[in-house]
A protein has these predicted regions:
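Interfacial helix-cap and linker-helix signal at transmembrane-aqueous boundaries
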Residues: 45-46, 77-78, 165-170, 223, ...
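C-terminal membrane-cytosol helix-exit motif in multi-pass small-molecule transporters
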Residues: 180-198, 215-224, 243-256, 497-502
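Transmembrane core module of solute transporters
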Residues: 17-67, 171, 178-179, 207-209, ...
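Transmembrane alpha-helical cores of Major Facilitator Superfamily
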Residues: 29, 61, 65, 92, ...
Length: 530
């Protein structure tokens, strides 16, 4: 093994391994909470700091942009100079960004500090999974990754709930102060985490780091800004052109490097490539579903941000219930069929949601969400374990970073592309419903979004306003349900990729270690690699 550890996996006590997992889970929780907690604070931030709509978007997107752009670099720094060391640096950077965001008095300052948080997260997130990979022997790794995945799902669900309650009861800055005690707990827990790194003295792949970081930032910028600027606008075409040029240059540099940051040979392995692609598509479908349901709950049904967050929780509960089963089932049926079961459950859940109407009962929504989340919990740990099993432990940080990049790109691309389709469908539907009923300028304003329609309706005579609200709500629901169908189609494509590229059974050495844990004294048959 080409990784040095203060304590190697087979020498680490079982109690200490699970303590390390708890600390890594706290780090993961911080990152995933921050992905969603700010959304509920945006209206209050807009009023207090006078932020425009585009600035509010960048308060959210600055975090995603920096996080996605620097993940590969963050993973590589941990591999080469110490995963524990760079995770601690990341926690401090994230804390500095959180304090700055809580204290800032300008919208521009808040955008900047969100970027600092993204930098910290890019150092923390790949370190958590790579440390787990190096601390846990293969026989326990699937279970540990299942718990790590469940905590990520919990963070996604807790963000809107905690954010809604804090904004309603304390104020928007409290969503950033929330991170400080969690960060303190993680930093104290790092005392128990052994150091690990690639024992080869490779140094930093500076050309690869620069090309990958700038290329990913250009790509994510194009994805984020595409819906607003227009996919064929010069700004977006330049961003995508830069992304293609820089990432192609990155591939060329890595292919020629004696010590590449991201060895391209990983992608020649069908299981690695298949798991990365499938994971991106799964997150694509997942975040789109949450994105539109949150708007439906708050704008169409008139619920508070806190209530909307609570109604998303069943998906997180489903993930928490499904993730621990993943490690058990993957040994019995293999990753391919487990991923197929995951996608099937998620497709079932999202198709059940296509029947949502304005007056749909809470139960008719949370049951499909629970099925959706349970499916995600079943399969996502198996996908992550497949990615990590395909890379040497010395490169665990970069393997973890690729896993995380696929998540971030999948989520950003899903919200941007399906969001564009849904906005277009909404605009067309509401225009057809209102043309000839209200002035054309009102139709134009209402067509911007269902949220704008609510504001416009309040300024109109009561009867006309009610007509506008009814048309806008129905147009949004019809468009949202179309978005759910597109999401289901994307999940079907994940099934095709999984069936084609994901192996029927785990890698031989991985399966052998799993079975040794179940029956240490028993003979271990060699599994099929088909």
């Amino acid at each position: 093994m080409s990784t040095t550890l203060d304590t190697r996996p087979d020498e680490t006590s079982s109690r200490r391994r699970w303590l390390v997992l708890a600390v890594m889970s706290i780090g993961t929780l911080i990152v995933f909470i921050d992905n969603t907690v700010v959304n509920t604070a945006l209206p209050a931030i807009s009023i207090d700091l006078g932020a425009s709509t585009s600035t509010l978007q960048w308060i959210v997107d600055a975090y995603v942009l920096v996080l996605a752009g620097l993940l590969l670099l963050g993973g590589s720094l941990g591999d080469r100079f110490g995963r524990k060391r760079w995770m601690i640096v990341g926690l401090f950077v994230f804390g500095a960004g959180s304090v700055g965001a809580a204290l800032t008095t300008t919208a521009g300052g808040l955008v900047g500090f969100r970027g600092v948080q993204g930098l910290g997260a890019a150092l923390v997130l790949p370190a958590t999974l790579s440390i787990i990979t190096n601390v846990f022997p293969r026989g326990e790794r699937a279970k540990a990754i299942g718990i790590w995945t469940a905590v990520g799902g919990l963070g996604i669900g807790l963000g809107p709930v905690l954010g809604g309650w804090l904004v309603d009861n304390i104020g928007w800055s409290s969503v950033f102060w929330l991170h400080i005690p969690i960060l303190a707990a993680a930093l104290i827990g790092m005392i128990f985490v052994p150091e690990s790194r690639d024992e080869r003295d490779l140094g930093l792949d500076l050309p690869g780091a620069l090309l990958s970081t700038t290329g990913l930032i250009a790509l994510v910028y194009g994805i984020i800004q595409g819906p607003e600027a227009g996919w064929s606008s010069p700004e977006i075409l330049v961003a995508f052109g830069l992304a293609v040029t820089l990432l192609t240059g990155f591939a060329v540099v890595e292919a020629r490097s004696e010590a590449p940051m991201l060895p391209l040979r990983f992608f020649r392995q069908r299981d690695f490539t298949g798991a990365v692609l499938t994971l991106g598509l799964i997150i694509f479908g997942m975040l789109v579903t949450f994105f539109f349901l949150t708007q439906f709950f708050q704008i169409v049904q008139g619920r508070s941000a806190f209530e909307a967050g609570l109604l998303i929780i069943p998906a997180s509960v489903g993930m928490i219930l499904g993730a621990p089963l993943s490690g058990v089932l993957v040994k019995k049926i293999g990753p391919r069929y487990l991923v197929l079961a995951m996608a099937g459950a998620m497709i079932t859940g999202v198709l059940l949601l296509t029947g949502v109407e304005i007056d749909s009962s809470t139960l008719s929504i949370i049951i499909p969400l629970g099925i959706f989340g349970f499916g995600a919990g079943l399969g996502m740990p198996a996908l992550t374990d497949t990615v990590m099993a395909a890379v040497p432990e010395a490169d665990a940080g970069v393997g973890s970073a690729v896993n995380d990049v696929s998540r971030e790109l999948g989520g950003a691309l899903g919200i941007a592309t399906i969001g564009s389709f849904v906005s277009s469908f909404y605009r067309s539907n509401v225009s057809d419903a209102l043309v000839g009923t209200v002035p054309n300028e009102v139709v134009e304003l209402v067509g911007e979004s269902v949220g704008v329609a609510t504001v416009v309706a309040a300024s109109l005579p009561e009867e006309v306003g009610a007509t506008v609200i009814a048309a806008a709500n129905q147009a949004f629901i019809d468009a949202m349900n179309t978005g759910f169908r597109i999401s289901a189609a994307v999940l079907v494509s994940a099934i095709v990729i999984a069936f084609t590229l994901i192996p029927r059974q785990m890698r031989a050495e991985q399966a052998t270690e799993e079975r040794k844990v179940d029956d240490p004294a028993g003979a271990v048959p060699e599994p099929s690699a088909a």
